[in-house]
């Protein structure tokens, strides 16, 4: 006979305990336990079960993952080349960032190719979804809508009429009737995700699930939600700005270094095929503290503008603020400048920003940050046709970075004439005739 009992769950890792604890033994996080009531049924007898026999790894046949296009090249890039049959993809992001919009556009393209799509919404009515869809464009009859909150209703329909792709918007609004807890609770999210994963693998259906995020920027619910799915995508960007960055945090079928760039318009999200041109639009010329760097996001080189402002502080402790860059990394470079270059920055405020709302983690941006800080400190504008990249060590040395040839080619394509790079990279380019020909349009190659 089924009965209810109280269990405490960790919101970060899903660790279960019979009592509340201040620190989770599983992930060592503090104050993450929440109380839930769960229904426990009688354990089934295992007498009639069939014995499970393991298979030798040499007898297992492998097959390449079958992929099909989403109709959005930027989304295909982040997914690793398209959608894999039987995959479970989690899409997270801030409210209003465009999660539902990009999935609706994907569904529109797939239905136009003749694929049957099931869009399940637990947050909006049919008319509300139709209003948003009309802004995007015309949909085909193979685009099916289902507004329910019970997972059993979804499973029942899928057994009758198997779709090619299922979209769940969102995972926090879908419940399983067998579990007596509120929607979005740890136990509900774990059970719903586990059953969706089983459905995807057994029926070879690609399933996309939308996840709400917390104020820390992580998907709401247990941390093991991200471990259960095949791919985790995050939408980044300012809701008040026009550009959105789609980044893969986890991908079992592709690289996690690729990004997709979109622009939010009235008609939906538009793909940005040349991010460098967009990110450098409106760049101020002959202004101190501004420099262009070439970052590598996966296999794609992107030119970005780094802006720095160094001014005399009016506080006892100088302020250091960064936007789009690692705060500790900028502080490290400020210390290197003061120790190795003799620049007295301990009495100055420093503000460093990436124009365009991008987040930059590439170590090759170190040299660009240094150039921007020195330019602002001395109030000397840099050459507007110059691109900089290179990693800076604690001893003040400039270290080589990967894919120097790709970075230079991107700079040439965008019309830049001067490239300052690590000496090791420059020597490698000079030894190759092919690389030399690619650099013929650069007027000056300076290695410092």
Task: Give the predicted meaning of each segment.
Residues 122-128:
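Conserved Walker A/P-loop ATP-binding site and its immediately adjacent core
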Residues 117-121:
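Conserved RecA-like ASCE P-loop NTPase motor core of nucleic-acid helicases/translocases
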Residues 144-146:
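General small-molecule cofactor/ligand-binding pocket signal
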Residues 2-12, 16-77, 84-92, 97-104, ...:
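Peripheral, non-AAA+ core regions of ATP-driven protein-machinery
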